[in-house]
Amino acid sequence: YHVNYDTQERTLKESGKLYADYVTGLVMPQVVILAGGLGTRLGELTKTIPKSLITVSGKPMLSHILEWAGGQGCRDALILTGHLGEQFEGFKHDGMNLTFVQESEQMGTGGALMNAIEYLEDEFILLWGDDYHPVNYRRLYASHKEHQQSLTMTVIQSDELANLRHENERVFEYSKSEISDSFNGYEAGTSVVDKSVLVKFGKSKKWSWEETVYPQMSGQIHAYIDETPFWDMGTPE
């Protein structure tokens, strides 16, 4: 609610307008796309082409992701490549400034970020190059700023896919492989990250971002609840 201090009236409509103005006025940060995985679940498809360059509905998966990001007001994208990374050479997207950083060997999701740390902005939206998740970036980023956490994770409240436990807008447990009766949400694949998190937990060897950072930041991750569906290129189908 917005409170008028002269009359002490509380007005939901005015509060909504203030929030909308704040969201509209945000300068959107860089998007960082993890696009260096081997894509083994796709079998023969990814032996000759990176997963995020596979054509889906007439254009590469990466183009779909960048089209959404651009429509949300993002203008800069850092794309982290690895497997067959040379195939990204010459890739362009209208309205977006693209920077590609290729790792010389498979370093895991965390290692890929560390390999590109000099190109990262102080805040960035972290995406997976094989997921299409059309969540409202402006609202997500506004929520990140409002809660003043260094990491905000988009969470879908799904019991079928659950891989985390959240409570009072905080993530307390996460597992990529284990199942727990306490889990009540699923990481949707879009996060807002402060570069300071990478500086704190980063390693010079191969390491997993999600399996390292999420458990160690238990209770410090803001859970942004949003039921926007996402599509994962996990199988050829």
Spans of model-derived segments:
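Aromatic-rich peripheral "rim/lid" segments of glycoside hydrolase catalytic domains that contact
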Residues: Y1-V27
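Conserved beta-strand termini and adjacent loop/short-helix elements that scaffold enzyme active sites
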Residues: V3, G82, V101-E103, T154, ...
